[in-house]
């Protein structure tokens, strides 16, 4: 019985990870090829409320461009442990030099609290790494997720440039 339980649990984790990878690939596809947004929107219907709010957070870690795949995966796991339970559909992945968190229908104040606590936990768990967070604007409808991503990208770039821990796009004065 125990062996069957372990096998079932392992398969469940494997399927969950495979589904997470597929979802992250769909988002990456939209970020690199915005024309596919309608096609991807249909594919995400089961996992996300595509008519709801989307908000993107980018996490930059100094020297992350030096990480190999194993180190990146280890850091990704550490970062995920630093998040509180996120009470909404979300995805978390590495893309184009940043860890990307995309939340769906999460109140912006809740997201800000979660990212603030995550930052504090990360400082304790990974004291040798300096991290920067850029938080994009909450956007209605999946079609606008790329705009939240671009705004998060601008915010994290500013955070890195001026050595700030966290910047919300709305507070940039742009």
Where are these regions (language model features)?
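Signal-transmission/dimerization alpha-helices at domain junctions
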Residues: 2-13
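Hydrophobic helix-rich structural segments at or within alpha/beta enzyme and signaling domains
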Residues: 8, 20, 24-174
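A conserved signal-transducing helical linker
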Residues: 13-21
């Amino acid at each position: 019985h125990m062996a069957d339980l372990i096998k079932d649990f392992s398969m469940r984790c494997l399927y969950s990870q495979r589904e997470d990878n597929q979802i992250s690939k769909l988002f990456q596809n939209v970020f690199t090829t915005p024309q596919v947004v309608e096609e991807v929107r249909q594919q995400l219907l089961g996992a996300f409320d595509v008519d709801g709010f989307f908000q993107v957070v980018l996490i930059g870690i100094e020297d992350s461009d030096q990480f190999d795949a194993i180190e990146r995966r280890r850091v990704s796991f550490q970062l995920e442990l630093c998040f509180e339970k996120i009470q909404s559909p979300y995805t978390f992945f590495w893309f184009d030099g940043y860890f990307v968190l995309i939340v769906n229908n999460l109140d912006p104040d809740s997201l800000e609290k979660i990212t603030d606590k995550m930052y504090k936990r990360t400082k304790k768990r990974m004291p040798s790494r300096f991290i920067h967070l850029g938080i994009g604007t909450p956007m209605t409808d999946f079609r606008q997720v790329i705009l939240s991503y671009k705004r998060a990208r601008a915010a994290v770039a500013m955070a890195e440039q001026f050595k700030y821990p966290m910047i919300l796009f709305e507070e940039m004065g742009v």
